[in-house]
Amino acid sequence: MTTAQSPTIPAGIPVRDTVVDLLIVGSGTGMAAALTAHECGLTVLIVEKSSYVGGSTARSGGALWLPASPILEENGAGDTAERAETYLRSVVAGSAPAERSAGYLRNVTGAVDMLRRTTPIRLSWAKDYSDYHPEEPGGTAAGRTCECRPLDSAILGEYRTRLRPGVMEVNIPMPTTTADYRWMNLMARVPRRGMPTIAKRLGQGVGGLLLGRRYVAGGQALAAGLFAGVVRVGIPIWTDSALHRLTTDGAQITGAVVGHDGREVTVTARRGVVLASGGFDHSMAMRRKFQSESLGEH
């Protein structure tokens, strides 16, 4: 006999009309917004359409572009916010507000510090994972990409099975990072780097199982770390709860109506709603409206 899976985390909390400070729609990196809000003293609720937590983040490579960040500084990358600003100005070329790029750069260090305080995530520099356009002013072939070190998903305890599975689940556990893939792909040409890398990750994965650990990497590690942080501070998550519509008082957003178990539930959000549910990239109409009218012409 199997026990039905609870639609809430923690289990047993009621799904009913409620009032919070901030509503987060989507349980991928929206969990980072939830943790930030919690640190600011706000009450937070996360709603997730599927039965799993992690969203598309858990199925991604989990890489973060973190220019002039503490991670790069600790590894002697020699990057600066000024160089990163020059690069963004070169590649974005006026297609987005300059203040948006400036705000991103201004908050990189704060974001890294927040992840370190609130989650078990530990980031490393994916050295030589080049910027997409290293030839542009401010670009760098050494790259500014950072990624999660392999993380033991067993820290989620009873909620480990609620983490969205990765795209490529294999029978042999081998938590592989982006940096690892580089040498694995070049193993035929550079076996002295490829073989030790494979042995290291295979040993970590199989050895971890023997010790009761379940290491994950990439987006799985990022999602698991954020999930662990959310569970630790008790931010509630409603799974199997899809956004139906936003509510408004005519002047501003006041919350949302979500569908759960065949009924509608109203969540009033005093400070706002964060839409982190993904799907935007699948709507060409929205992409043309909010990104560029020329998308899809070539």
Report each predicted region and the residues it spans.
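Short glycine/proline- and acidic residue-enriched helix-loop micro-motifs
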Residues: 88-98, 206-213
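Alpha-helical scaffold segments in soluble metabolic enzymes
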Residues: 36, 87-90, 103, 110-117, ...
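Long, well-ordered early-domain segments
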Residues: 92-134
